[in-house]
Amino acid sequence: MHLDHQKILEKYKSYNITVDEAKIKKAVEFAIKYHGIQQRASGVPYYSHPLEVAEIIAEMRLDTDSIITAILHDTIEDTDLTLEEIEENFGKDVAKLVDGVTKLTKIKFHEDNVRQAENFRKLLIALSDDIRVLLIKLADRLHNMRTIDFISNPEKKKKIALETLELYAPLAERIGMQQ
């Protein structure tokens, strides 16, 4: 069993005694399989990112489907795994959540829209008919900010930081996620 997988399970078991370990392990195996040899800017295997996001979600005490969604959140966007395959293997709820996170990721915030950030935040909330989608996206952004120093392109780093400051930080505060 993968070390990060164990940390996620331990956190989850601390508040939920009915853990579907097999389903979580299967999601980890999918992340490892589908992200394959992809790497983060830091050089670590890409699948480490969704596992870190899942650990944040476990710290937030969300349900099994949310943890599995965090583990699979980048697979539709970055691999050849399909929503249909996610639904077949993990159920309709997980597929819907992964789809929601993917849709939020596709919405691009532009620096020149700083004054419209409030409208953009409202759009993100409106597009998330399930609060778990927003929480997973915020956990994703939190982990990306924790590892931003590995991005070598200063413009890309600045864009991510500005987007976080103008969009995601106020959104996190609004829904009570000050971390």
What are these regions (language model features)?
Residues M1-Q179:
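Active-site helical microenvironments for divalent-metal-assisted chemistry
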